[in-house]
Amino acid sequence: MMKTEWRGFKGNLWQSEVNLRDFVQNNYTSYDGDESFLAEPTQATNTLWGMLKELQKEERAKGGVLDMETEVVSGLTAYGAAYIGEGTKELEKVVGLQTDKPLKRAFMPYGGIKMAEQACTTYGYQPSEKLHEIFHKYCKTHNDGVFDAYTPEMKLVRHNHILTGLPDTYGRGRIVGDYRRVALYGIDFLIKEKQNDLANMGDREMIDEVIRLREEVSMQIKALKGLKEMAQLYGYDISQPAQNAREAVQWLYFGYLGAVKTQNGAAMSVGRISTFLDIYIQRDLNEGTLTEDEAQELIDHLVMKFRMVKFARIPSYNELFTGDPVWATLEVGGMGQDGRSMVTKNDFRFLHTLENMGPSPEPNLTVLYSSRLPKAFKHYASLISVKTSSIQYENDDVMRPVWGDDYSICCCVSATQTGKEMQFFGARANLAKCLTYAVSGGVDSKTREQCGPKYRAVEGDVLTYDEFMPRFMDMMDWLAGVYVKTLNLIHYMHDKYFYEAAELALIDTDVRRTFATGIAGFSHVVDSISAIKYAKVNIIRDETGFPLSFKTEGDFPRYGNDDERADEIAVWLLKTFMNMIKKHHTYRNSEPTTSILTITSNVVYGKFTSNMPDGRPAGAPLAPGANPSYGAEKNGLLASLNSVAKLPYEYALDGISNTQTISPGALGHNDEERAQTLVGVLDGYFNQGSHHLNVNVFGIDKLKDAMEHPEKEEYQNFTIRVSGYAVKFIDLTREQQLDVIARQAHERL
C-alpha cells in the first residue's frame, strides 16, 4: 500500500526496497527550456545572506576563524537548535547548524587530539583541559593508531614528502551518504532495513570480517537514531517520509548535517540531489501548494547552509588545501542510461544561486556534461561560468558507462555510485620527486636521506634515455608498493577509530569500495622524460657528486601542444603507474584507482622537489593536476585540451583534473557570445573522451589587482577554479596567488 507521503509517485521497485535510482527514473520531469522561469531572491534570502556576508567579513578580519569550540566534542546531538541570528528562525526555510552559532567551528578529536588542539591554539583558543586528559589518556584516536603502526619506511617517505597529504591527521572524507533516503523513506524504514541486514549476517562464521561488519552496522543504526533525535531538537519528526518539497529539502539536509557534525573529512560531498528534489518541487507546483519564488527560495536557503559548513584545520592542512574548502560537491545535469536528459528546472535553480547570492566556492557545483544535453541548459551553464568562474564540468559520457546514471562526485572530480559505494581517499604520490630519486639512487635532494631503495645512481654526466628508464621504472614500482601499504594501514585505523557511521548508514550495507591513489607532478615527469629522450640532458653535480640540477640542450616536445611524441609519454606514464598500483593487495578488497589531481598542494609539493630535466627549478610549484607545465603550451587552448583529452579515463577512474583560464576576449565580445563559444569548446573537448574541465574566464590583470587590493568589495567573493575545487582568490596565500597568476591565461583558442 502506497504511503500518503508518496501520493502521485510512480514505480513499484523503490517502494519495496531502498532504490533511489528507480524512484528518480520513474518520476523526474526533463526540462528543455531556458532560464526565463527563474525567480529573483526573496526578501528572506536577501536578509539572511546579508547577515552571513557580514559574518564572513568578521571572520576574515579575525584571521579566517570567527569562533571555535573548545569544550564540547561534536556529535549529532551535542548542541540544541541554533539559527543564523536572533529572530531568524521563521526566515530560514532550511534550518540546522553544525554547532550553536553560525560559522563556529566544532571540536572534532577522533581524527587526532593533537590536531584538534593545534587548530584551536593556532587561532588563539585554549582547548579544554578535561578533553585533553580524556583523549590523551583514555580515548585513542585515528592519528594515534596510524603512528603506532607506521613502519620506519612509511615514516621516512612521509617525512621526505614523496607521499604527501596523507589522511593520517584528518578525516579522510570522500564518502557520500545518500541523503535523499532520509526524505524518501524516513528514518524508521531505514533503521528497519539496517536491522534486517544485521539479522541476516549472523549465520556466517564469526571471522574478523563478519564481526567487524556487525559492529559497524550496529553503529550505523545508532547513528540513524541519533539523526532522528537531532531533527527533533529543531521540532521535526523525520521518522516518516517527507510530505512535500519543503520537508524533502529539510529531511535531506538533516542527513547531510549529521555527516558534517560527526566527520571533518577532506571532502564532504552532498551528492546528486537536484533531480530528486525537483520531483517534490514539481509535484507541489502542480498541486498549487508552492510557487516558483518559494521553490527558488528553498534551493537558495539549502545552498546557503552548504556555504556555511566549516571545519577547524591546522596550518599544515591549510597549506595543502587552501581557502577553507569543504568539497560540498553537488551535481547538476547528466543523461539517463535510457537516453533521456536528466536536466530539470532544479538544475537551473542550483546554478541560479550563483546569481541570487553571488559567486561562491561552495557548494562545489559540478555540471555532468554531455554534448546531448539540452542546448538551453548548456548555454546557461556556460553563461554562469563566464560570469562567475565558479563551476566545473565533468564528462557524463565517460562516467556513465562505468558508474551508471545515479552517481555522485565524492570529492573534487571522482565519481561514486550514490548509496552503493564508498571510496578510500589516497592523497598523492610525487612522481616528480620519484624521477629525481631514479637519478640519485633514492637519496633525497633536500634532506640527503636514503629515502628510496639504494639502487645504483646514474654515474655519468649525461642522462641518457636507456640508462634512466630502467631506474625510473624500478623506483616508481617501489613507490607504488609503499604507497599502497601506507594507505592500507591508514584506512584500517580510520575504520577502527573514526568510522563514518552517519554517512555509511545511508549507504548499502553490502558496499563496493574503491581505493584511490593519485599522481602529483605529472606534466613535469612527462616533459622531463621527453627531454631525456629527444634532447641532451646534462647532470650538474655539487662538490660531493650529488646530482643537484640539470642543463638541457636542444628542443624537445612538450605535453600540452597536441604533439603525439610528448602525449604518448603521458599516456604511458598513467598506464604504467596504475598497473604498478594494481599489483598490490588493497584494504577490504577495494578496487584500486588513481587520479591526476593536486588541489592547491602543488605549491607545497613543489617546495620539496628539486630541479628537473624539463627546466622546472627547485622549489617552484608543480603544475596542477593533469595541466601542462607552466609555459609549455605554445599552440593555444584547443591544442592543450587535445593533449589532456588523450589520457584514458579507464586508467584514472579517480579523475583527471584540468584547469584552464581563458581571457574573456578569446571567447567573444560580450557574455552571450562568450557563453556560445564556450559551449562549442566544451562539446569538442568532451566528445574526445576527456574527463574534466575547470573553466576560469578572466584576465591576469584582474588577479593582480585582487592580490594587491583584497579589501575591494568586488573581490570579497571573487571565486576562481583551481585543481579540483573553487576558492575565493583572496583566501589563497600570496605564494599561491602568484602561482595562479603564473599559469597560462589563453588569449586565443
Q: Which role does the model predict for each range below?
A:
Residues 2-749:
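Conserved catalytic cores of very large enzyme subunits
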